[in-house]
From Swiss-Prot:
The gene is Kctd5. It is found in: Cytoplasm, Cytosol; Cytoplasm; Nucleus. This is BTB/POZ domain-containing protein KCTD5. Residues 213-234 are annotated as: Disordered. Residues 44-146 form the BTB domain. GO terms for molecular function: cullin family protein binding; identical protein binding; protein-containing complex binding. It comes from Rattus norvegicus (Rat).
Amino acid sequence: MAENHCELLPPAPSGLGAGLGGGLCRRCSAGIGALAQRPSGVSKWVRLNVGGTYFLTTRQTLCRDPKSFLYRLCQADPDLDSDKDETGAYLIDRDPTYFGPVLNYLRHGKLVINRDLAEEGVLEEAEFYNITSLIKLVKDKIRERDSKTSQMPVKHVYRVLQCQEEELTQMVSTMSDGWKFEQLVSIGSSYNYGNEDQAEFLCVVSKELHNTPYGTTSEPSEKAKILQERGSRM
């Protein structure tokens, strides 16, 4: 088994290194030199106040991208207008919900976005903090998502609604929520005692069913709910 030996340096001149007990090995000398180069009073940890939410991370994490806003913040760039709160945390007026994916990307280099967050929101933050590699990654993810969505077959929802002639105008006004007429079928007249006959129709309407990236459909609007209620009463 190989043995490690320290190679001693020549004793320091009088007055230099007197408190270190004479000559030092090269390895120990290099370690002491590295410690001497670290600025005194500078902590390894950095506290951020992003939109009222606190984040604690290391300078090494924030300095991953030398061109980013966070790198300049850690370097105390005089051209960067930054303030601190009463706890000493850097104040950043941004959405803390979307800062989480940005910070985690700097920590481990992977983009992880929760299902309740939009890729466009993460892209907005990546551009604000000027993290070029993250910007490219999110844009690629958005293109991939849009490509999958465009390749999905279009589905339609159909409703058959019964209405009288005088209700047709109101029916038309409810079509602006993506619903459109497919067919109008006359089914004769309804007999109202003492009143004129009212022509009745069956209205066939349809709407495209859009899927979200996670396979769920969007919630129907108020107009869509009205149409669905009319169809269910038939």
